[in-house]
Amino acid sequence: CDSITIEAGGEAGLFYAFQTLMQLIFPSQKAEKGSVAIPCVKISDSPRYKWRGMHLDVSRHFFQKEFIFRMLDAMAMHKLNTFHWHLTDDQGWRIEIDRYPELAAVAAWRDETLIGHGSETPWVYDGTRYGGYYTKEDVREVVEYAARLHINVVPEIEMPGHAVAALQAYPELSCTGGPVPPFNRWGVSEDVFCAGKEETFEFLEGVLTEVAEMFPYEYIHIGGDECPKVRWEQCPLCQKRRADNNLKDEHELQSYFVKRMEAFLAAKGKKIIGWDEILDGGIAENAAVMSWRGHSGGIQAANMGHDVVMTPHLFVYLDYYQSEYNEPLSIGGMLPLEKVYSID
């Protein structure tokens, strides 16, 4: 062989073919000047999955945009095409929203951070203020950089649970009215967006309007996971919302919440995707499901005609221990590489 021929069905295919070509060059040759030798092969392949993603939680641990650029480079090398950017959670709000400046000034920061696991008591904290957020210019740069690598960016704005950071800045959107202190540890808080207040939906619609303008991809992730119903059960406004809409329980109230968000985003030409808890109480008509608690939720959603992304935590979460428990601190669990490969 004395030549290289690449055929592809489009620009993305050509890009992926180049990644394959680069992988055929031995690492020891890349630093050498002049010609290099590569194996004489014929490769014919295509993606197995439409959505080939990587998720980065920047709420609990903030990463500068330069890190994200390097991560996108690595994703492109592995022919991944979707960057799931987890921008909000209990521990921090990481995206600038012009209409709500307190999200950057207050919600992006916590007083300190838990050292170790939440199950290890008494809790010990580091005493260091922690936080940060991405400006709209930062977001634009990330989205444009990703696009050059044929990577779509899916922002995640958590609702109705995992909302403490937002409620820290705007406590009037909680069921109790606040104050809602910073969430400095891991786990799940009972403080969630109040489903009985119209102000909650006005706030989220304002946020999502700006988010939709920043992210051109068709999907926006709305979270939907791990939403305790304790506050809703005790909240007169949430119970009135339930009664007025003939909802039999708080799971259906969450479904009402998600469906309102879906309708709002659909009017802006966007689709929603959420964690598999959005199946509880009745799934929104056009929602896609990201199944993290195992395979069953994804299978259920697929059988109902919904698009599904499989993300079962026991197989694909990267914040688990990989071999011995004397590794650097992880959230828990044990996930050796061989188990990751066994997911099929």
Report residues per predicted region.
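Substrate-binding groove of N-acetylhexosamine-processing glycoside hydrolases
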Residues: 141, 197-219, 226, 240-344
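Feature activates predominantly on carbohydrate-active enzymes
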Residues: 1-219, 235, 260, 264
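Conserved, charged catalytic cores of large soluble enzymes
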Residues: 232, 236-240
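Flexible loop/turn segments at secondary-structure boundaries
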Residues: 62-64, 90-96, 160-166, 221, ...
